[in-house]
Amino acid sequence: MVSFTLRAIGACLIGLPALITAAPTSHVSNDFHVVEQLNGVPQGWVQEGSPAPSTQMKFKLALVQGKTAEFEQRVMDISNPKHADYGKFMSREELDAFLQPSSQVKDSVFNWLASEGISKRSVKANTDWLTFTTSIATAEKLFNTRFYTFKNTADGSQIIRTLKYSVAASAAPYVQMVQPTTKFSAPRPELSSVFTSDLEITSSANVDCNVTITPDCIRELYKMGNTFAKKDPRNRLGISGYLEQYARLDDFSTFIDMFVPSLKGTTFDFKSIEGAKNEQNSSLDSVEASLDVDYAIGLSGALSTYYGTAGRGKLIPDLDQPNITENNNEPYIEQLFYLLDLPDSELPAVLSTSYGENEQSVPPTYSSVVCSLFGRLGARGVSVIFSSGDTGVGSACQSNDGKNTTKFNPIFPAACPFVTSVGGTRQINPEVAIHFSSGGFSERFARPWYQELDVRHYLGHELEKGKWDGMYNPYGRGFPDVAAQSYKFATRDHGKTIGVSGTSASAPLFAGVVSILNSIRLAHNKPRMGFLNPWLYTIGRSGFTDIVHGGSDGCTGTDMYSHLPTPYVPGASWNATKGWDPVTGLGTPNFEKLSKLVLI
């Protein structure tokens, strides 16, 4: 996996200083209240200097949401097949009205911004979010802080951040978060580069599916037959693209000709978010993008869109240049804003994302806010699917609270309760859990009701009593939810056929399956599936093959990305067991069964 700067960023995930997230009223200093604070520069970054005061930077401010509990219950009701409101998704307008903050909240924050010269006219208001661009000089006064340029020691990339920010006392009760400020970490594609290699195959003929995976292997293993999704604008398949990864049309076309000739002529749209480019002739690595489109579309045949979101490229030397703001985006937030602003008719039905990062490396408020935004997509009928990660029980394996406690590391957003997390398997006859499949238990998000019985059974009956006590949170959201093949997928990239491994393969594979299931439901005048998890853990569970062999590993003593020394935990693993487990979830899809269950 690599960072949003296209290089390994594991160094910044080890020993990241503790993030102290306080309620806005917890700290007071000269009429300012501290919102968020780091206790030092995160490991893997060095402070370089100060940006020019005139440097422009775009900020997104999250207002305190007064209806969080009500909204979360609404999402669960809409997604629960046993509830009367199942499938009654909210429109863009209904969601906006439901979450709209009071005039008092907005006025208080607008008045504070205006006091520093940021007029209401220059602020874009979007439900409970405000977006504005201002100079570093103004931002430093506004947030009572100093911004600095920080360089990543692994790849040389630079970002502008601060270690602490505050808001005026008059606005403090109404401000939940402002970014980009304290978030240094960056998501990575969930690819295991160790298993990337050239392949000498030109079609699915005579392929040993125990050695190499092709679309035909998946169709046979998961009993998909020759079923594809109808090209229906109500069932658009969305694929997330970051890191200047460009999905190349010529590679995709060749892949389809080689492995899915029945879909000859199939293509996908490209949508640019925050100025993302669509470089079809780039020499940069695009393995992740290729893998995603090859298998999500190659399996489903669905009407598809690749959503490219501009990442944080290297800063140019002259920080006065106007495009400096492009290098400080928070890609998840940018993508979520774009999608949630789409009319209902343009929103994807399924969104597949193969990126993640250590949960503890993300500021707590940031992870909470972003997870809630994924919930908003669910409320509007979008199935949000994430790869679980490629670090097994963990790679850094220590806390970032200053104590350096040895522990397993859950992955974000895979551990967000509003997304469907997909772990990895390999082999057929039998299919087994793959060693790098990330899983475990969130330290931020409580275990949701839909998986309570399954996770409680695992902890009480399948996990040896006392095993790994203190290494994980037994009350946290368990992940992954399901699993799929993840080893040596035949993929086309830059004119070559290569074998690629990782849960980056599992997520688009499962997204393709969900797209076909949506198509079946729509053909029977039923709504699309939306947020999947309540259905998966109830009606859908009998449509999965339980994986009971294999397990994950991790905590090997060397970080797999930075190669720095880390705690060694002998035998660290989650085993695949009967029922749900934190390496393969409920198991792998049996399409033949699922296609019937979705009509119940």
Curated annotation (Swiss-Prot):
Keyword Translocase applies: no
Catalytic activities: Release of an N-terminal tripeptide from a polypeptide
GO cellular component, one term: extracellular region
EC main group: hydrolase
Glycosylation sites recorded in the entry for this protein: 210, 281, 323, 404, 575
Cofactor binding mode and count: Binds 1 Ca(2+) ion per subunit.
EC number, UniProt record: 3.4.14.10
Keyword Lipid biosynthesis: no
Keywords: Calcium, Glycoprotein, Hydrolase, Metal-binding, Protease, Secreted, Serine protease, Signal, Virulence, Zymogen
Main subcellular localisation: secreted
Signal peptide from the UniProt entry: 1-22
Domain of life from the UniProt record: Eukaryota
Prodomain positions: 23-202
GO terms (BP aspect): proteolysis
PANTHER family: PROTEASE S8 TRIPEPTIDYL PEPTIDASE I CLN2 (PTHR14218), TRIPEPTIDYL PEPTIDASE SED3 (AFU_ORTHOLOGUE AFUA_3G08930) (PTHR14218:SF32)
Protein name, UniProt field: Probable tripeptidyl-peptidase SED4
Source species: Arthroderma benhamiae (strain ATCC MYA-4681 / CBS 112371) (Trichophyton mentagrophytes)
Source species taxonomy: Eukaryota, Fungi, Dikarya, Ascomycota, Pezizomycotina
